[in-house]
Every structure is written in structure tokens, then in C-alpha cells.
């Protein structure tokens, strides 16, 4: 599973660094089947065996809650990387969560829909369990607080044999049609609902919960359609995600590359957060001073629990794939959720994202900005807006490589920008590592695509990077092309990888594209070993 693969990835890395005080870290695998009763049984088995320092995983809320009660009663820490219902950690001093809960998620989607889109009415369909109901309640409360009206808030079940009819009956029972639909569902019920809504109400926007916020949702939709692909039927559907790789950091790109190499498939945000759960746990074990002595396991568990609870602010010491991990008073990690949308069956970052604003950085007029929607408040934390610009590079050639002298190289490439909203002043874009300032000049191509803009440039310029020759003849060097906006900070604007334009951006695919373009043909004695596109911090 994604959990075991990701956790084992970090365990292998940690063991390569000496484990925990010289002790090797081992993973014991249990399967709860996504069922609360089975999860409770598994937890009781863990208690009886008395080997586990902590329990990681728990992708579903009801099983996680059931397991957490048993673990807490026996003073065993637990940490979920996927279960989002508030009940998972509420009142449980032994359970932690490395993602946002549904209170934060529902509030985020409601504010995004009402503030950024101006939606004033909604119909909610939710999974008939704690995940769906808590997400629906959070959305309903926040949407109503912003002056919205919820026409109906109804449960559906992915196990229903008449699911499509159930959905149709709910929608048809409403006398008025809403500005939007919100699907707080699992993937299968969400797929059936999305297909029905897109076929019968194509003009009404659809938002989903984080269960829908992944490329894998498109695969489930295709399966429901009986096709190989979803054929764009879910294009335009918005959903939040704990992490979207096209807007993520270099650390996230490295994780994705390693995961693909180890597993052979693209990771989801759940894989990333599962990796983070292992990272924060093992680092906490090292810092807490646990003995590793089986006879002291009860004391070690308490030390670990207490140390995890003490990680109550952002720190580079616990920086994972999804950011700097910490736990609030409810043992949740509240970070800026990413909002994505489907385009050509791919889940990509939406044109507007959020960034965290600390209490110390709140402007004096923050109350006014809260009312205007410039600042959002989610789970007692504040967030501002960030504009997203999709950027793509197509390398034609690297040449004139000077390793020992000026550390320069000539790059010939196409550069494009795809974005919505106000037009960009390209004079404000510069290249940090170009030998001489680059004037982009007139674009090679410029056109409107749907609601957005597309601008293409051809560039042939010299760039410079620092080359460390100490490891010669086994040295590795980076041929980087770094661009930024001169006047706007990252919190205002982020350049992200245009996965729609570039296509697959795995290490292997990137190298294959460079090889097909003969990009290194004129550089002798060197060959490419990796390639990344990422938004640097």
C-alpha cells in the first residue's frame, strides 16, 4: 500500500544513517481493511504483542477513530496520514495527525467557493460516515457564515446498489438549482455523482473534498464510465489536496522521483503524508531519548508521545515533504491546503492558492481584509492569496560548457507562461543565474486559451552555476535555469511547473525528452543523470 511503501522508504533512509541510537528500525504491517471493527481487532492484537512503539497509517476516519480508542486506553501513540474526521484526534491525547482535519478542509473549500467564485447557494452530497458528515458540516457552517444558502445536505453511500438514482432523487427534490455542488464523498460515490452532475447540470460548478483531489479520481471515473480514460468529463471540478506536486518544493520533487523509482508509479498526497508521518516520528524518537529496550517500551512510548506533543511550532528540524510539521492543541497539523482542479483528466493546482500568515505578520487592517476576502481564517490560523502562473521549459540544447573556468554554459530553450487573470508584465521577470540580463523581448507566440493567456518565448543565452570539482572524476553538476519575478514575493505569486504543457515530469521522462532533443550532443564526456522542474522557496 501507499502507507507501507512510503513509511518503509523513510525507514530505509533512517537506518542508513544509523537508525535510532544504533538500533535498527523495523516496520510491522497490519491490515485493518478500512473497517472499524477490524481496526479495533488489529489494535487489540498490537496491544497483546506489545512490540510497536507507535502505529502509523489509518487512511479512513472511522477505522482510525476505533483504533485510536484502543491505543489510547493502552498508552500507545498513533499517527494518521490520511484520516481527516475531527473525531480521530478529538479527546485522544495519544493520537496525532500530519494533515488538516475536515474542519479546516470544509472551511477552506467553503471560503474558496464563496469568496473567490462568489457562489451563494449549494447542494451538498456527503458520504454516509464520519468523514463525509464532518466535512459536510464544516462546509455548511462556513458557507452559511459567508452568507451562502445550502439547499440540501444529504448522505449517499458508495455501497448503494442504486447510487445514481439516490443522487438524482436528492438533486431533483430541490425546488431551486444551486450555484454549486459540493461532494464530501469517497472516490466511487464521488465519481458516480460527478458523472451524473456533469451530464445533467454541466453549467453548475462542482467542488469535492480531498478524497477527490488526486489523479486517481480520474481513473475511478473512467472505470465507472467503462472507458480507459475519463475523456474530460470531470474537467473543471475543483478539490483540495494536502499536497499538489506541481506547486510543491524541491524536497517534494525529490520524494516523488524516489517513490517512482522504488514503486514504479506516481505518488499521491497520501503517499507523501505517510512518508512525513515516518519522518516526524523517527526524528522525534531520536530527540526524545528513548532507550529501545523492550523492557522499557511503556516509558519509551510516553517519552515519544510527550515529545510529539511538544512540537507545537514550525521548525526546520521537522521539515517533511508537505512542509514544516507541527501539532496544534488538537494534535492536528494545519497547513495551507492546496486547491486543485481537473484539466484534461489531470489534477493540477488551481490559479489561486493560499499561504500561511503568522499572528506577528498580520497587517493592522487584517479585520478589514478578512471581510473583503483578502485574508481567510481557517482553524484559528490566517491565510492570504497567492496567484499561480504555470511555467514550462522545453530544452533544445545545452552547449559551450565551461566546467573549470567561468562555470558557464549556453542554453537554448523555449519558455512559456500560462495563466488566468491580469496580464503579466514580462519586463518584471528575470533570470538569477544568467551571465547577462535577459530581455525576453517580443514573444514567439501569444494567444488566449479559454479563460487564460498563453505566451511563448525562445531564449538562447549563457547561464552560470557553481561547479564543485572536489569529487573529480566522479563529480556531478547542475545546469540550472532560474527565473523569478522582480517585484512580487512568493506569497503573492508562484511559478509552478506546467504539467499540462510539459507532460510527465518524472526523472526518466525528463531525461528521455532531453535525449530525444539531442540536448547534450555537443557536450563530450558528460551525460545527464536526473532532471527536475520545481518552484523553489
Which role does the model predict for each range below?
Residues 5, 37, 51-161, 203-239:
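Extracytoplasmic ligand/sensor domains, especially the bilobed periplasmic-binding protein
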Residues 5-27, 144-147:
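Signal peptide-proximal N-terminal region
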Residues 33-53, 111-112, 162-177:
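Short, well-structured alpha-helical segments in soluble
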Residues 61-72, 178-200, 280:
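Hydrophobic alpha-helical
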Residues 100, 194-275, 287-292:
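Extracellular/periplasmic periplasmic-binding protein-like sensory domains
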Residues 261-271, 283-347:
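Segments of small-molecule ligand-sensing domains
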Residues 305, 331, 340-380:
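Extracytoplasmic ectodomains of secretory-pathway proteins
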Residues 364-404, 409-537:
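Non-transmembrane, solvent-exposed beta-strand/loop segments in proteins
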Amino acid at each position: 500500500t501507499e502507507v507501507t511503501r512510503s513509511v518503509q522508504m523513510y525507514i530505509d533512509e533512517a537506518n542508513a544513517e544509523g537508525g535510532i541510537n544504533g538500533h535498527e528500525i523495523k516496520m510491522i504491517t497490519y491490515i485493518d481493511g478500512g473497517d472499524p471493527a477490524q481496526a479495533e481487532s488489529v489494535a487489540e492484537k498490537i496491544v497483546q504483542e506489545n512490540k510497536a512503539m507507535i502505529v502509523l497509517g489509518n487512511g479512513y476516519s472511522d477505522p482510525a477513530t476505533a483504533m485510536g480508542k484502543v491505543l489510547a486506553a493502552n498508552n500507545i501513540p498513533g499517527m494518521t496520514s490520511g484520516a481527516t474526521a475531527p473525531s480521530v484526534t478529538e479527546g485522544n491525547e495519544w493520537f496525532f495527525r500530519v494533515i488538516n482535519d475536515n474542519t479546516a478542509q470544509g472551511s477552506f473549500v467553503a471560503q474558496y467557493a464563496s469568496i473567490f467564485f462568489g457562489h451563494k447557494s449549494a447542494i451538498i452530497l456527503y458520504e454516509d460516515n464520519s468523514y463525509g458528515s464532518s466535512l459536510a458540516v464544516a462546509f455548511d457552517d462556513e458557507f452559511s457564515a459567508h452568507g451562502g444558502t445550502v439547499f440540501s445536505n444529504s448522505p449517499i453511500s458508495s455501497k448503494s446498489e442504486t447510487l445514481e438514482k439516490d443522487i438524482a432523487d436528492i438533486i431533483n427534490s430541490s425546488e431551486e438549482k444551486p450555484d454549486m455542488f459540493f461532494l464530501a464523498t469517497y472516490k466511487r460515490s464521488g465519481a458516480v455523482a460527478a458523472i451524473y452532475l456533469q451530464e445533467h447540470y454541466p453549467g453548475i460548478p462542482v467542488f469535492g473534498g480531498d478524497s477527490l483531489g488526486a489523479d486517481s479520481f480520474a481513473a475511478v471515473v473512467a472505470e465507472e464510465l467503462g472507458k480507459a480514460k475519463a475523456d474530460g468529463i470531470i474537467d473543471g471540478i475543483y478539490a483540495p489536496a494536502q499536497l499538489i506536486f506541481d506547486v510543491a518544493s524541491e524536497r517534494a520533487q525529490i520524494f516523488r522521483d524516489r517513490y517512482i523509482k522504488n514503486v514504479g508509479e506516481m505518488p499521491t498526497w497520501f503517499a507523501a503524508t505517510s512518508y512525513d508521518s515516518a519522518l516526524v516520528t523517527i526524528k522525534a524518537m531520536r530527540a526524545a531519548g528513548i532507550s529501545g529496550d523492550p523492557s522499557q517500551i511503556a516509558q519509551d512510548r510516553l517519552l515519544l508521545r510527550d515529545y510529539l506533543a511538544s512540537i507545537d511550532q514550525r521548525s526546520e528540524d521537522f521539515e517533511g515533504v508537505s512542509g514544516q510539521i507541527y501539532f496544534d492543541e488538537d494534535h492536528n497539523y494545519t497547513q495551507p491546503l492546496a486547491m486543485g482542479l481537473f484539466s484534461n483528466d489531470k489534477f493540477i493546482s488551481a490559479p489561486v492558492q493560499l499561504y500561511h500568515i503568522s499572528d506577528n505578520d498580520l497587517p493592522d487592517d487584517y479585520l478589514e481584509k478578512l471581510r473583503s476576502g483578502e485574508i481567510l481564517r481557517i482553524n484559528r490560523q490566517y491565510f492570504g492569496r497567492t496567484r499561480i502562473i504555470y511555467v514550462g521549459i522545453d530544452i533544445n540544447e545545452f552547449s559551450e560548457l565551461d566546467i573549470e573556468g567561468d562555470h558557464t554554459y549556453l542554453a537554448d530553450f523555449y519558455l512559456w507562461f500560462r495563466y488566468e487573470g491580469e496580464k503579466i508584465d514580462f519586463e518584471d521577470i528575470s533570470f538569477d543565474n544568467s551571465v547577462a540580463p535577459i530581455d525576453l523581448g517580443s514573444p514567439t507566440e501569444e494567444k488566449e486559451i479559454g479563460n487564460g493567456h498563453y505566451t511563448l518565448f525562445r531564449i538562447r543565452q549563457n547561464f552560470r552555476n557553481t561547479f564543485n570539482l572536489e569529487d573529480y572524476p566522479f563529480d556531478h553538476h547542475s545546469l540550472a535555469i532560474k527565473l523569478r519575478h522582480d517585484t512580487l514575493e512568493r506569497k503573492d505569486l508562484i511559478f509552478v511547473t506546467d504539467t499540462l504543457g510539459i507532460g510527465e515530469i518524472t526523472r526518466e521522462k525528463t531525461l528521455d525528452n532531453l535525449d530525444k532533443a539531442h540536448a547534450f550532443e555537443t557536450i563530450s564526456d558528460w551525460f545527464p543523470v536526473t532532471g527536475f522542474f520545481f518552484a523553489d522557496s
